[in-house]
Structure formats: C-alpha cells, structure tokens
C-alpha cells in the first residue's frame, strides 16, 4: 500500500509540473489560473525539456507576484565550428533544468573601448554598476529570461471595472497573455538582457515579458562579404529566439499570435531590421522602436570587409583567402577577439548588421520605399535631447560652447558623414546657418542648445520621421511619440534634456519599486505616474495594436491629483499631419514634429547635392548600381512584398535610375522658415550666376578655337582630321594664349592629334547621396576610372589621379552571382537576394 501511495504522490507532482511533453500550459491557460502560481519553484514543460522557475514578490502592494524563468536556452551554444554560423535549435535535456539565476552575458570588451557617444546616458553614468552585469561572460550565452505574471494585474482589473470601456473584443482568449520581447541596445557591441528586469512591466500590464542575450561585436556581426562569413549572426539569434517563443510560450500561458518586439537604440534598429527581413515573417505581429531606426548612420555597417581585415591583421589571421581567414579567427579564443580595439569612423560602427542580400535583403531605406513592412503595427519615437553625449565633449564649461568649438564640431560632423569633397564647404556653412540662433548668436549656452538639436535631429529625429512616414504611406498603423522627461540624478547637467535611453526606466516601471543600481534616481510621484502611463500605452499596444485601448489611463491609485493623460487620445501618424504624442508632465497631441529641421535634412540637403551634381557632371554617368547593391529582380518576379497602397492615395512616382533622393512629403506646403528661404534664394542666385559665367566661358573658348583653327589651317589642306585641314597643334616657337595652351597640353597628354579632347579631363560622378548620409567618407570611391565627363578647359589643371578602390583590402572578393544560388547555411532556404 505504501508503494501505491508513493506512486500517487509522484503522479500528482508530475501533473503539477506541467503534464506530458507537448501538452498545454500547466495548471490551465496561465500560471495565475492554476496551482503553479502558488508554488515557490514552479515547473513548466517546453518542447525541449522541463524548466524550474522562481516566484518573486515585488516591492509594491498593487503588483502581484511574478514567476521568473532565467537562463532558458533558445539555441545550441555557438561554440567551436558553430562560431560565425547561424544559430541552431537547442538540444533536449533530461530531468528538470533550473532557471532561477541569470545566464552569462555574451563576450564583450570590458575596457571601455567603445566611444561613450554611442551608448545610453544611464549606462555611461553608471559604468561600475553596468560592469557587474557583464562580469560573467561566456560564448555559451544564447538564453532567454521570462517574466510571467501570476495574477491579473492592475490594468486588467481597471479594464474590467470601467463601465464606459467594455472588455477588449480583439483578444481571442483572455487566458492567453500577450508577449513582449525586449532587444537591448549598446551599439551592437555591449550590453545584456540581464540588465532589464521585466517583472514590474509584466505584473502591471498583465503581459509576459522576455529579454535575451544575443551575440555582439565581432562574434555577432563579423562579415567578409562572401559565403565565408555572411554576418548578421546577432540578428539571426534574435530570430531564433522568436522561433522558440512561437513554439513554447503557450506552455507559460502566452499567446504565440500576439508577440511584440521592442528595443531601444541599437535594439530599436534591430526591431526595424527584423520588420524588413523575410526570415522573421510570422514570428511577431507588432513592433516598438525607441530611439532608433535602420536608416541612421550607426544602424548598418557598409564597410564590413574593412573592419574584418583590420581585426584579422591584429590577431595574425590576415590571409589572402577569406575562408582561411575566417577559419583562423574561428580558432582564436573569444577573449582575444573581443578585446581588440577596432575603432570605426565617428558616427559609424565597426561590427553591426550588414546588407547581406538575405537576412537584410537590400538597403533598409530601399526596402521601406518598396513597402517591405509585411503588415506590422508600429510604435516609434524619440527623446527630446538624444544627442547629449555628442555635445558634452564640445561643452568647455557651464557657460556653453564657444564659437570656435561650434565651428570645429560642425566641420568634424560634415567630414565624417559626407563623402563628396567639392560640396563640403557649402554644406558646412548651410548647417551652421540653420543651427545658429541669429537673435542670440553670441550666447554660448544657446550654441550648446542648437548643437544638441543638430545631433538629435540628424541621428534620431529625421530618420524616425522618415521611417514613420514610409510606414504610413502603405496604410500600416503607426504611432509616433516624443519623450520629454527624465529622472533627477546626481551628476546630471542642469541643461540636459531627456537624453538617449532616458525612457527605459519608465518603460520597465522602475519608479514603482524604487531606485536601482543602474537607475539611481530620486523618483517622485510624478515619475511613478508617468511610468504607469508609459506601461499602459506600451502594453495596450501589445494587446490590440492601439495604445489607447483596451485599458484607459487612470493613476488615482498613486495620488488623487488628476492624470492629464486621461483626456488625451493618441492619434495615428499619417503622412500629411504627422501627429505625435508629447509624453511629459504636460501631455498633448501635436503635429509635424520639428518640421523645418526634418525638411532640411530630408529635402534641402539632398537638393544641395543635386545642384552640385548638375553643375559638375554631364550626361556621362556611372551605371546606377555601380557603387551599391545590384537592382532588385523584375517586378514580375515572385516575392512576399506588401501590395501597393490602395487607390485612395495618390500614386507615388516610380524611382528613376541613378542617384536616389528622398521623396518630398505629400502635403508639405507650409512655409518652413526665413532662414530656409534665404538659403534657397542665395543658392539659386549663385547657380544662375555660375550658369551665365560658364556659358560665356564656353562661347569665348569655342570662338577663339574656331579663329585659331582658321589661322593655322592652310587653304585646301587635309590630313589631320580637323575641318579645314592642317595640324591642330601650333607650329614650334609660336606662343599661345593661356587657355589655348591648356587645350594643347591636354591633347598632347591624351595621345596627340588622334586623341579625343573629351577624354583628357573627366571628373567622377558623385556617389549616391542618400546612402552617403549614413556611410563613412571612404565607403564610396569619389573618383572612378569609368566615370568621365568634360570640364571647361579654362577651369584649371587636371584633377589628381583616382584614389584606390572601394575596399582597400581586395583579397576578399565576393563569388560571382548565379541565378539560382541561395544561402543554404541560413535557417530558411528561400531568399530575396538581389545579387
């Protein structure tokens, strides 16, 4: 009898542990609905084995307990031969796996080699605390952390109690909770999901929150540009984590058909890239991009080969064959690789996502212009003063930025971001003009403020608005926000606005449980209220795709003071009004955020380049794809692209071959500013005067050459190929005017009488400008042998010889493309490769 009793006890324990393999969620649809929610160490079945979590109480009476599953493997460890390879599904394990402690972080440099300008403020201000989260590092780092609420949170209770807000009808099964996967930032080089505790967000919003570690730096994004190492392994890790969630989250009470990805900084860029990748199709439904897009200068690495060769040379793996170099790097210890100091150009990255033709099929902006959104709902926004770290180096004192420091910073900015030398002076002066407060131009504090706005507008605001506009053009739901609040912390400059990463403590509910080592702020009741507001918006969006529904804004549980967000309805962003929500202590819905400056970067700056192109080039041009990825397949080729917008919108013109330019925003008919009008007027006047000058010069040269030919040609002579006969070159000893002497020297240099004068002097066609906005100056050759055009002979001496080719490290050429080739090593055999 006692044996039978033991068997019955064991059977009951097994049933509490989650049922049989492949079964549903233990104890009912969610942990909070069964006995598991009451256990200290609940056990859940997954497709790969059983995992044991831990129940945690939160430091707030309105928040219920959360079950944490920490360090759940979502992929096979990328060790040995699996380094620089796409991830594989994890192997099954016997028994019960403990998931009660945080997993190791992925290998990264601990010596602060990454420039501070590329990291969030809370990270750089608390480096010692941040270092404690990445002390435990291992190449075996592909793990998830899950935070599962055990009971309905305050938001669900408020929704059910609201008489004017009926229960959400969009939720198919109220027992299944939405899932939110957070992608951490850190310039693709640093960070870990362990830094972000999702417990408060999960408990307050009644959602399952997941964080993850993915491969970083050289181990996550090294690329040779060919099949030896295609790169994007960190992105593939994120896709594998989404596959794991789709397959297993139902066992934890989650809804695999309501998965939202969200991230900040580089994590937000990953969110945008996953939207554009067909490998992630069907794995998530909504996306939140906080302070990051795929079209900023730091989002994509357009020089992967350069930095791979630099790294290989540093560790003794510089080989002529790319496969041999990668194999050598694969044998090196991970610590030796990540500790190498490979510095990128300022405002760029050394190791990050690349356009590989598969995971990232094409330049992200091209994909967005072609509607590669695949029907994702999107919430996107920026902080008020994202560029704080860019300005702190230039601020010499509390009095602000001096005039010389302002000029130097702008010049350095242009030199590092724009690759055509002839137009740099014009662009530099135009930027200074646009970002000078002419009413108070000698005020150092005002110069600091405008410099902060310059970096914020260029690196964050303009790319975010362009992304939202491209998204809305295809009738996809998109909501835009601007974040105008930050917590009070020691050491923070009084003049600083909400900087890069300042929204994160409010998204994760830190004010509700008090200051932490990473966010050592003096949180007030206003901070708690604002955090509740942000979590309500974010989790509403994860539930329905609408941040306003199903839960209304109500924070009376904090204090009796009215919540101003209760009367605010967050409107969708559209291409005409571009509505956005101002998130701060005084919320409001407005339109056309920083419209003048956004138009400057998206319209006037490309227009300045077009004027330069028309002035210095003729009809002889490079092939349209000579300096960028090959064109897409013909329109009739099969694909999964989203259909064009409905007929209710005016059709957008088809892009013409050649250098691209941003499309003008439809409906932007407003008067931008006096400064912008003056700039355009001055530019147009200079263009007109130059055209007149060149016309007169051409006429004068042609007239003199005609007279000279008549003087030098003997009557009735022939034999030179010149009309009228006679030699084209003058007789010995006869002096020529300067402009005729230059023509003579050009003809001699070009091979004498038989040479074509048009072959003597031809400058190159400038590169694609909109890509040059995001590439380092040496990404694209400024002179190419095949791009020759004729300049007037009186303009000056011949130009210098062309510089070396695009990538100075030539031993890694990509293999010749074939019509049927695809990447068999990636998780999916299908591909939209344009090569």
Curated annotation (Swiss-Prot):
Cellular localisation: Cell membrane; Postsynaptic cell membrane; Presynaptic cell membrane
Residue positions where Phosphoserine is found in the record: 713, 718
Keyword line: Cell adhesion, Cell membrane, Cell projection, Disulfide bond, Glycoprotein, Membrane, Phosphoprotein, Postsynaptic cell membrane, Signal, Synapse, Transmembrane, Transmembrane helix
One Gene Ontology molecular-function label: cell adhesion molecule binding
Extracellular side: 15-677
Membrane-spanning intervals of the chain: 678-698
Positions of region (Disordered): 623-668, 790-835
Topology Cytoplasmic: residue spans: 699-835
Family recorded in the similarity comment: Belongs to the type-B carboxylesterase/lipase family.
Role summary: Transmembrane scaffolding protein involved in cell-cell interactions via its interactions with neurexin family members. Mediates cell-cell interactions both in neurons and in other types of cells, such as Langerhans beta cells. Plays a role in synapse function and synaptic signal transmission, especially via gamma-aminobutyric acid receptors (GABA(A) receptors). Functions by recruiting and clustering synaptic proteins. Promotes clustering of postsynaptic GABRG2 and GPHN. Promotes clustering of postsynaptic LHFPL4.
Name the record gives this protein: Neuroligin-2
Gene name of the record: NLGN2
